[in-house]
Curated annotation (Swiss-Prot):
Chief subcellular location: secreted
Leader peptide range in chain numbering: 1-22
Protein name: Moronecidin
Keywords per UniProt: Amidation, Antibiotic, Antimicrobial, Antiviral protein, Fungicide, Immunity, Innate immunity, Secreted, Signal
Species of provenance: Morone chrysops (White bass)
Propeptide: 47-79
UniProt xrefs under Pfam families: Antimicrobial12 (PF08107)
TM ranges: none
Lineage: Eukaryota, Metazoa, Chordata, Craniata, Vertebrata
Gene Ontology cellular-component annotations: extracellular region
Modified residues (Glycine amide): G44
Tissue specificity comment: Expressed in gill, skin, intestine, spleen, anterior kidney, and blood cells.
Subcellular location: Secreted
Gene Ontology biological process terms from the UniProt entry: defense response to bacterium; defense response to fungus; innate immune response; killing of cells of another organism; regulation of defense response to virus
Comp. bias regions, Low complexity: 52-68
C-alpha cells in the first residue's frame, strides 16, 4: 500500500512539473550518455588507443630525425 501511494504521489509531482523544469530531459540525457559510454567501451576504446599509440610513435620518429639532423650539422661544422 505504501508503494502504491508513493508511486501515485511521485507521478503527480512529475505531471504537475512545468515544462521548464526539464525533468524528462535530464533522464533522457543520462540514458544517452550511458549508451554512448557503453558503445565507446565496446567499439571505440580500442581504436582510440591505437590512434594515440600511432601518434606517439610518429612523434618519436620525428624527434629522432631532428636529433639526427642536428648531429649531422654539428659534425659538418666540426669538420
Amino acid at each position: 500500500m505504501k508503494c502504491a501511494t508513493l508511486s501515485l504521489v511521485l507521478s503527480m509531482v512529475v505531471l504537475m512539473a512545468e515544462p521548464g523544469d526539464a525533468f524528462f530531459h535530464h533522464i533522457f540525457r543520462g540514458i544517452v550518455h550511458v549508451g554512448k559510454t557503453i558503445h565507446k567501451l565496446v567499439t571505440g576504446g580500442k581504436a582510440e588507443q591505437d590512434q594515440q599509440d600511432q601518434q606517439y610513435q610518429q612523434d618519436q620518429q620525428d624527434q629522432q630525425a631532428q636529433q639526427y639532423q642536428r648531429f649531422n650539422r654539428e659534425r659538418a661544422a666540426f669538420d
